[in-house]
Amino acid sequence: MASNDIDAEALVHSDDPSHPANHICTLCAKFYNLGWVTGTGGGTSIRHEDKIYIAPSGVQKELMKPTDMFVMDFNSKEYLRKPQVLKPSACTPLFLAAFERGAGCCIHTHSQWAVLVTLIVERDFGKDACFEIEEIEQIKGIPKGRGKQGNLGYYDRLRIPIIENTAHEEDLRESLEEAMEKYPDSYAILVKRHGIYVWGDNVHKAKTQCESIDYILQLAVEMKKLGLPWTK
């Protein structure tokens, strides 16, 4: 085995459960049990120093191994490791958009609640509306915004932009970046009839924010069933 091949393999071998290659596998197995990455959908990526670890495309996320990971150099955007029999994630350009704005982890799910909320918003508020909700305790799990101290409060309004879906995942980047510019305090973007992207400063924050948002989205769907408003 060539020296550079050995170095590439070393990038994904560690006994540390918090190592990105191990952590992505653990997270995706949990996300599968939540129904977020069913049928090979969704993905997760972690930025660790100057390296980006990315789950592959088209694989059963609950069965992934650390050796399935792609590793990219953050500065050059060149792959340092590419598993020969797997495809790079189609989400990669979207993950990069989050990392270029300081994120340490980005999660993409195909949550049913996310999909349903995008349909409800379009029906009730119009094609260009964003998702808005307030006076829900779990909103406290969402940061106020990039560069701001603390999290949103109970009386604050959570806003999550919604972008149109495209035939190919990578083609979402332009509209995703536009939404990031328009809503600079948002840590999530919904994709109509598709799912959601959630990012955070680190893995812990991205995971807990994704959990909080999914909980809020489920509540929002149930509130609509009962005729309850999301905002005053």
Curated annotation (Swiss-Prot):
Active site per database record: 137 (proton donor/acceptor)
Subcellular location: Cytoplasm
E.C. number: 4.2.1.109
Broad class of where this protein is predominantly found: cytoplasm
Any GO MF annotation of the entry: methylthioribulose 1-phosphate dehydratase activity
Residues binding substrate: 91
Pfam families: Aldolase_II
Cited InterPro entries: Aldolase_II/adducin_N, Aldolase_II/adducin_N_sf, MethylthioRu-1-P_deHdtase_MtnB, Salvage_MtnB_euk
Residues reported to bind Zn(2+): 108, 110, 194
Keyword Transcription regulation: no
Main EC class the enzyme belongs to: lyase
Keyword Transit peptide assigned: no
Keywords: Amino-acid biosynthesis, Cytoplasm, Lyase, Metal-binding, Methionine biosynthesis, Zinc
Cofactor details (free text): Binds 1 zinc ion per subunit.
GO cellular component: cytoplasm
Co-factor requirement: Zn(2+)
Catalytic reaction list: 5-(methylsulfanyl)-D-ribulose 1-phosphate = 5-methylsulfanyl-2,3-dioxopentyl phosphate + H2O
Pathway(s) per entry: Amino-acid biosynthesis; L-methionine biosynthesis via salvage pathway; L-methionine from S-methyl-5-thio-alpha-D-ribose 1-phosphate: step 2/6
Gene3D superfamilies: Class II aldolase/adducin N-terminal domain (3.40.225.10)
Function as written in the Swiss-Prot or TrEMBL entry: Catalyzes the dehydration of methylthioribulose-1-phosphate (MTRu-1-P) into 2,3-diketo-5-methylthiopentyl-1-phosphate (DK-MTP-1-P).
Family that this chain belongs to: Belongs to the aldolase class II family. MtnB subfamily.
The protein's name in its UniProt record: Methylthioribulose-1-phosphate dehydratase
Protein source organism: Pyrenophora tritici-repentis (strain Pt-1C-BFP)
Gene name linked to the record: mde1
